[in-house]
Amino acid sequence: VFDSYVNKTLPQKVYVESEYINNFLDSTLYIKTDYEKSKRVFQGIEKNICYEALYNSYNAFLSNEKDKEVYILKYICNGFDVGPKINNMLTISYVFKVINMKKRSLSECHKLKGLLRFQEIAPNFCYSSIHPDNNIIEPLGHHFINRLPTMNFIIHDKIREICFIYNTKEYKIIDSKNINIPS
């Protein structure tokens, strides 16, 4: 977002490095993750657009929607230009798309908050596996930290092969491919 907004260029496609297949016809630009720039973007969105835009962007990013990064990028860059009214500009396709991606992610997360069941796999240690359409493991995990603050637990997203692990003090989201998890 930072580089795109500063350089006034919007890419046609955004790839995660591990998913990119080199194509000689494309003009590519590799952008390394820069936590200082991302911090500035987060603060800038909240200050210059509104908290709702940050919330919408985060929850839309959890979506499994194809090309979500481009929609979110356009939404944020335009938001920096027009401010909080970006959220009411639903006739613009990428704004509409971001709002709908957010709604789908939040809806699925809400549904799983009620449906998820843990099983005790060791004393004071619970496990649950999920197969969500969207990457909602972090907000779902935070919900259960608030509900079960004294319980150690793992929520295993079997689709993405990641786990939300909470030990009553802190949480981590880790790759589940290399750890022994019950079937």
Model-predicted regions and their roles:
Residues 15-18, 31-183:
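Extended, charged helical/alpha-beta scaffold domains that provide interaction surfaces
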Residues 1-36:
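N-terminal ordered "arm"
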